[in-house]
Amino acid sequence: MARKKAEPKKTAKPNNNAYIEGAGLVADEKITMSLEKNYMPYAMSVLVSRAFPEIDGFKPSHRKLLYTMYKMGLLNGKLTKSANIVGATMRLNPHGDGAIYETMVRLSQGNEALLHPYVMSKGNFGKAYSRDMAYAASRYTEAKLMPICQELFGDIDKDTVDFVPNYDNTTTEPTLLPATYPSILVNANVGIGVSMASSVCPFNLSEVCETTIGLMKNPDFNALETLKGPDFPGGASLLYDEEELDKIYRTGKGSVKLRAKYQYDKESRCLEIVEIPATTTVEAIIEKIIALVKAGKIREVSYIRDETDINGLKIGIDIKKGVDPDKLMQKLYKLTPLQDSYSCNFYILVHGYPRIMGVYDIIKEWVAFRMDCVRRRTSFDLAKKKDKLHLLKGLGKILLDIDKA
């Protein structure tokens, strides 16, 4: 009798549909609760991690770059390739090389975006006042720290600020830089976060230091006596408004008006714009004037060209015969970005929280920060001296009784 073939065992099919409790259910929730739980943490993380400057005057991306350059020995050393700096900065800043290099460009001397640049540059770093003058790739340019950075890093190795681990716990980085002057007010700082934006205008370094000394000696000191107004790197004239400046100094909010500077070449009937507001670019001005000429709103201009070269910014405007250049400029100020407003919104991170502060409050916070740095430096130096004194006392005992030793 023939045997029956054994039937193959049926294997159970895997269940790919895993059960998730609560999946597919729609729960009602007040929008205020949802915003508090989801939106606010996201907004705060953007503000704290990249958008707003802190009391030392730097955003995290600026601080990571400058500290990396300091550790590379670029404060007193020779220029090195920008690509090398960008690669080293990635140990602290987990972003693409493009974003890091763009940060370096803005901090550089060649870009002319800052009143007191932090990076000495060699090569083409573009110009802040021109969209078309793009910066060269990082492999073609070189950089090192400017001498002013000595005031940022002079005490950093004396426990003046806290250090935290980097993103992968392989090294540490400072939470702040122990700047010996109020750098937050010396260079412009613009940051756009979520639902909030910061715009800190720059002031003259000497005037900021005089104002700080004045407020330290007398809390009722009038900042307008020494701090005459913002000082922008591109020049341009500041239309002085004492009431508006006083409002900015006390509240941190307001605006200042900037006006381009020009000179007139009578022989060639040419207006030469040599300084423009920091809020605009050469291309934006030329495009606006061309649009006004085409629209028939300006008939006095025969030709306009960009004459910017290695010697600096210049816009040439040829005018028709019999036109008064001063009257034409007044018209251009009114209709073009040759006169523009710089909005001030002094949002600064203090102990991890965004605060809007005027010049008085900013200097007060900076003085408190600097006093803490000096106190910590003094404690560090004292501990070192005590250790040395202990060794010297031991050495003294040995020398006084050398036979027993």
Predicted regions and their residues:
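Catalytic phosphate-handling regions of large nucleic-acid enzymes and associated NTPases
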Residues: 2-252, 314-316
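C-terminal interaction appendages of subunits in large macromolecular complexes
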Residues: 2-15, 22-26, 30, 190-192, ...
